């Protein structure tokens, strides 16, 4: 009988956490992974805008685009964002080990990982090095199933690391409160037993900002969309106890 995908991931996490590379840093960055196993949940939008919001508080921030689709890298390519970024796709365990070494060599205050939406190296690397995992989830049943798998991986990593890390912040994403699903999302995601952060709503300003190659704080400062991101940044710092 074929094993369940979540069980497969858990086994991979165990092997990866106790693999050859040990994660040590001279001056540790705070590593925030934005991760879900399903695409279309607003992951890159959250990663880019959160990175820029954190940089606005005079903190050094590095964004690592680990998704082979390169959405974050395309956004960065316009040169209009206040953060540095690198394209470092994660496709296999070797890529995950390379990411661990790369992050350990950085001196930024924050390293944001825009993880790919598939099972494998992304979940393993996040489990090994992240201080906090943000899990964007839309108001759809498919997203809720994918979120359960991510939460299971996070808990497995906590057990193996024996440090309470990574912490988890579930972020309702692309939410439209006019719909029944949008109104019920907060209640639904609480079932995972992890901290639920402020919602990032479905707003055209995010789409327009991407088209302009800007982050929301420059494109539409003090807008409702910008408020979503500032509220998320506050929740992130609270989760990290900053």
Predicted ranges, named:
Residues 1-33:
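Extreme N-terminal, non-catalytic leader segments
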Residues 26-31, 35-41, 52-124, 210-218:
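P-loop/Walker-type NTP enzyme "switch/lid" segment
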Residues 46:
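Hydrophobic positions on the alpha1 helix immediately C-terminal to the Walker A/P-loop
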Residues 122-141:
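Inter-motif core of Ras-like GTPase G domains
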Residues 147-163, 173:
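Conserved C-terminal guanine-recognition region of P-loop GTPase G domains, centered on the G4
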Residues 176, 186-215:
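Beta-strand-loop-alpha "switch" segments that mediate conformational coupling across diverse proteins
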Residues 207-230:
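Inter-lobe coupling/hinge region of RecA-like P-loop helicase motors
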């Amino acid at each position: 009988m074929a094993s369940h995908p979540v069980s497969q991931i858990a086994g991979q996490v165990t092997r990866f956490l106790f693999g050859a590379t040990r994660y040590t840093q001279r001056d540790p960055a705070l590593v925030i992974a934005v991760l879900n196993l399903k695409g279309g949940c607003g992951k890159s939008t959250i990663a880019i805008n959160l990175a820029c919001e954190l940089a606005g508080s005079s903190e050094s921030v590095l964004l690592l685009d680990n998704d082979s689709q390169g959405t974050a890298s395309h956004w960065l390519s316009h040169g209009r964002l206040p953060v540095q970024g690198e394209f470092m796709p994660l496709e296999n365990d070797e890529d995950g080990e390379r990411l661990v070494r790369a992050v350990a060599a950085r001196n930024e205050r924050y390293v944001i990982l825009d993880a790919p939406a598939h099972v494998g190296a992304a979940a393993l690397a996040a489990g090994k090095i992240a201080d906090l995992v943000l899990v964007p989830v839309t108001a759809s049943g498919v997203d809720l199933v994918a979120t359960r798998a991510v939460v299971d991986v996070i808990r497995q990593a906590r057990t193996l690391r024996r440090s309470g890390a990574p912490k988890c912040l579930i972020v309702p994403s692309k939410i439209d409160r006019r719909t029944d699903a949008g109104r019920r999302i907060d209640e639904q995601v609480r079932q995972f037993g992890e901290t639920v952060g402020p919602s990032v709503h479905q707003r055209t300003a995010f789409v327009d900002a991407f088209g302009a190659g800007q982050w929301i704080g420059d494109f539409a400062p003090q807008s409702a969309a910008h408020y979503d991101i500032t509220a998320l940044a506050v929740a992130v710092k609270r989760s990290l106890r900053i």
